[in-house]
Swiss-Prot record:
It comes from Methanosarcina mazei (strain ATCC BAA-159 / DSM 3647 / Goe1 / Go1 / JCM 11833 / OCM 88) (Methanosarcina frisia). It is a multi-pass membrane protein. This is Putative manganese efflux pump MntP. Keywords: Cell membrane, Ion transport, Manganese, Membrane, Transmembrane, Transmembrane helix, Transport. GO terms for cellular component: plasma membrane. Probably functions as a manganese efflux pump.
């Protein structure tokens, strides 16, 4: 695969991570550069790791991934999105949210990188070497996640709770989109 193909694949896979990073950037107060780096490392790392796992697992997990991955992603994103909405409506009146604990980052990273697992499986079926695509996918996701978190922080303080509700709705919407595509509704 060419660099351009791998780069475009990385962009496509990074869109969910970008949206989630942007949502996270709107809610975390006080926001630090280290928060954006945490998001970028988790999302970039998982987007790079999941294709490797898919490639190694190959056809052994293809049935599971195709049957259950959209449901898992939907469940995780709906839960986290619902939690964000709840916290916006009933949480700390100062608007300070620490949604970047490691368990939350892990769940978000898994939810946004399940599609990368399927890409790895397809690479295995096609006999495509994995190293270059994985490096590019991870780097693109790292940069997009970092930028998304910073952008979310920059615009988030203008709207406070409304942006957190919007972020929660975006996560739920991503989950619904993943599920709808799996069910051939769209």
């Amino acid at each position: 695969m060419s660099f351009l193909t791998n780069f475009l694949l990385g962009l496509g896979l990074a869109m969910d991570a970008f949206a989630v990073s942007m949502s996270s950037g709107t809610t975390v107060r006080p926001f630090k550069v280290s928060d954006a780096l945490k998001l970028a490392v988790f999302f970039g790392g998982f987007q790079a790791l999941m294709p490797v796992l898919g490639w190694v697992g190959g056809s052994a997990v293809s049935g599971f991934v195709s049957d259950y991955a959209p449901w898992i992603a939907f469940g995780l994103l709906a839960f986290i999105g619902g939690k964000m909405i709840y916290e916006a409506l009933y949480g700390d009146p100062d608007g300070k949210v620490n949604s970047l604990n490691y368990s939350m980052l892990f769940l978000l990273a898994v939810a946004t990188s399940i599609d990368a697992l399927a890409v790895g499986i397809s690479f295995a079926f096609l006999g495509t070497p994995i190293l270059e695509p994985v490096i590019i996918i991870g780097c693109v996701t790292f940069v997009m996640s970092f930028c998304g978190a910073v952008l979310g922080y920059r615009i988030g303080h203008f709207f406070e709770n409304e942006v957190e509700i919007l972020g929660g709705l975006i996560l739920i919407g991503l989950g619904v989109k993943i599920l709808a595509e799996h069910m051939d509704w769209i």
